[in-house]
């Protein structure tokens, strides 16, 4: 069990952000194609985050430091941390910082083909680094751990090295269109399998790992100017979210609803009306 929540004593974060971007639009070679590549490098000082419940337990056992052990509250009698009132205090505070870097890629292609228009789009993100500095170094550790490609009690939400969305669509000149979208989330390992002394124990526990996840969505549309109708199915193959034991991911409720699709197949219908403005 964890006691989580905000902290009114937390101070503002400070960040240094560096970005470099490149846009390609080779209209003379491939008309209708546009691609953008952006590199980012962000360093946050005094970051508002948590030390992590598992890190707190690990470092208490390794160092015996009151800085960690004072946050471990075992249940009376049983000394448990998951029943009878036992918990680890894991509220937010200003830690040493967070460093992250990666590359975002977007591309699109639009062109009239046959009796309509073809459209392709792609959005991908490569996470090169995501490092958390707890600001608490010990005799055995430097207080920093890397979360790229991991999830769990310390790294929390899955941070796959690669994720993307791709869409293929075609719209006829008379207004009917169809598109299919694919969503991909790369595989992540349980953070306690890490050999980083600040993070994991190096345990061989593949049961906590999450394999790559893929979802597909289908949308049909019809343009009845000024009304546009849309009928679609998200997660058309009714793929269930990856299930992990609750103790492998902190307070995630056996999956990560903020990352994966927790609902399954769902159908939607929408209508939009476009208003025109008259110039007087």
PLM region descriptions:
Residues 17, 163-165, 213-217, 266:
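Transmembrane beta-barrel architecture of outer membranes
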Residues 43-45, 128-131, 182-195, 221-280:
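C-terminal beta-signal and adjacent terminal beta-strands/loops
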Residues 5-8, 89-94, 141-155, 197, ...:
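Extracellular loop and loop/strand-boundary signature of outer-membrane beta-barrel proteins
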Residues 11, 21-25, 96, 106-110, ...:
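Transmembrane beta-barrel domains of outer membrane proteins
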Residues 28-33, 115-118, 174-178, 226-231, ...:
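Repeated loop/turn-to-beta-strand initiation elements of outer-membrane beta-barrel proteins
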Residues 1-36, 88-103, 110, 157-162, ...:
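Outer-membrane beta-barrel signature, preferentially recognizing the C-terminal barrel domain
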Residues 179-184, 191-216:
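Generic long, charged, amphipathic alpha-helical segments
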Residues 36-193, 270-274:
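Gram-negative outer-membrane beta-barrel transporters
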